[in-house]
């Protein structure tokens, strides 16, 4: 019985954390970005499915990348995503995205969420 209760608590806690991270993504990113595998719906930003580990400006269904991001040569790893989400325009001047998230805990949760999209 104790094992069942502990398992249930862990399951519920995990679901609460997933829901919180999903809400953070919706609030901060979903207006401009899809995260559905294969979604080619035109939005203000590229689909973020599989973004972690991908070279910037290579999501083929998105065609509105700035020259600055095309020429950046960066790969979206945790370090680069954190800099990008802190201040995209300062990290890659000339980009079309001007998102800034001062709260590091929010940035890290969004990055953790993006890492699951594969």
Task: Spell out what each predicted region is.
Residues 1-8:
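Sec-dependent signal peptide recognition
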Residues 75-118:
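C-terminal capping alpha-helices of c-type cytochrome domains
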Residues 22-71, 75, 88-91, 117-118:
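Periplasmic/extracellular electron-transfer cofactor-ligation site
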Residues 19, 23, 46, 79, ...:
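Generic alpha-helical secondary structure signal
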Residues 2, 32-34, 81-85:
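Residue-level detector of functional hotspots within protein domains
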